[in-house]
Amino acid sequence: YRGLNIIYEKRPNLRPPVLRQAVPLYPNYVYNSSQVNRAYSDLMALGYFKSAKIAFGEQPRSADVTDIVSFIGASADSTQTLYTREGYLTCNILCTPTLKQSVKVDLEGSTTSSFYGLKATVGYQNRNIFRGAESFDLSFTAGYEFMKAPDARRKRATEFGVTTGLTFPRFLVPWRTGRFRTVNQPKTKVELSINFQDRPYYARTLSSAGITYMWTNSRYSSFSLRPIDINVVDMTRPVDPEFLGNTSNKYLINSFKTQFIGGLSFGYGYNNQRKNLGGNATNIRFNAETAGNLIDAVEHAFFSPAKGKEQYTIFGIEYSQYFRTDLSVSRKIMLGGATALVGRLYGGVAMAYGNSSSVPFDRQFYCGGSNGMRGWTPLGQGSVANPHNDFPVQTGDVKLEANLELRFPVWGMIHGATFFDLGNIWYIRHYSGESEDTVFRFDRFYKQLGFNTGLGLRFDIKFAVLRLDWGIQLHNPNNPSGERWIHNFKWKNTALNFGVGYPF
C-alpha cells in the first residue's frame, strides 16, 4: 500500500492507510535517521502496539531488482535527489500489538478529623474499536464521604459519574489536512460525561461535551487545543438555606447556581522523562482557558437581559464568563540507585468578569488532598477558617504551592518517601461577608502559607503504584494568630491520603 508491503500474522487488524500515515518512510528516497525516529514514535503513539522494531539490511542494487528494493527516509513530498549508487537498504518493521481491550481500577481514599472519604474509578478501554487505531474509553466513578462531626445534620456525601471518549489518530476537521504535515502524532478526542453529586447541603448534575485536538512537535513537547468545551451545572436540589444563611459572601452564593459554561482551552506539556523512569527529568504543564466571550458578544449585540435580571442567559441559563490559567513545574534529581529528590512549584489564578461575579465552583482552586497539601483535606483561604465546618467548602481564585519529596527504596516493591508541602489559596478580590485576610496580597501571602511534613509508602505492582501518605501539619494559617505554629502532636492535625500513582 503506497510503498508498504504489509504482512499480518492472522486477519488484518489495522487498515493500511493508518499504518501509511504513521510510517513516513518511502521507497527510493535517501535514508534519513530523523524520519526513522519519527516512524517509531508515530507507531507507538497509535496506542495499539506494545513494541515496534525497525531493522535495516544492505541490499546491492541490480538492474532487475529496481522495483523491489526500498530506499528509506524522506517524505513523499521531499525534493531530495535519488541515491543512484550501490548500497541500497531494505527496511523491516516488526510491530507487536498490545491487548486490544483492558480494564483499569483506580482507588483514592482519605481520612481527616472531619470525615472519611473513598473514591473508586473503573475504566474500560478498546484500543482499536474500528480497525483504525481508534481508542474507545468508558469509565464509571463512585465516591462516598462520611462526616465524623456528631452534630452534622447529614453525614453522607455521594457521587456517581460516567465518562466516555473516542480518540482518533488524526485531526477531524472539515477541510483537507495536508497543511498539518509538519504536525507529529495528531489526534482528535471527542468526550461526553455526566456526574451526579449529592452533598449534605445541595445536589447537582454536571454534564459536559467537548472536542480536543492533540499533537506534538518534538520528542518531549505536547500540545492540546479544546475549541469546543461545553459544561452545564444543574442544581437538582437547591442549596440548603441553612448553609447559605451562615454567609453573606456573594462569591460563595453565586458559585452554587445553575450555570452554562461554553469556552475553549489550550494546554502545553513538556516531559523529558525516559521510559524506564531512570535519570533526571523535568516536567512542565501549562493550561489556559476562557469561557463565555463569544456568547457574550452575540448576546450584547442582539439581545437584552431577561426582565428583572442583570445577567444574560442562553437557553434560559446564566452563562459564565471567566479566565483561568495555571502552571506546574517539577524536577526529579536522581541521588544514586533508586533514590530521588523531586520538587514541584505550582501557581494558578482565575478571574470572573462580564456576565459573572464569580468563577464556577468546579473551575476554582482547592488546596489539600492526596496530590497537594497532604496535611489537609482541604486547606482554607488565606488565614481564615471557613465557618461551615461540618462540610467545608474552601476554594479560591489564587493558588500557590510548593512540594519537596525524597523517594527511596525500602524492600522489594515497597518504596518510601518523606515530604514537605507549602501552600494555600486566596480570593483575587474582596467579597462581602469575608475577611480582608482571604484576599491575596504580596505583602502578607507568605505569612498565610500552610506547611506540613509527612511520611509515605509506595507499592509498585508493575501496572500501577499504590500510594499511602500521612501528612502532619506544622503551620496552620486557619488557626488564630499566635497559635499557627503547631508544637504539640494531635491526631486532628494529621491527614491520611490514599492514591494511585505519584502526586507529581
Located regions from the model:
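Outer-membrane beta-barrel "beta-signal"
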Residues: F459-A464, K490-F504
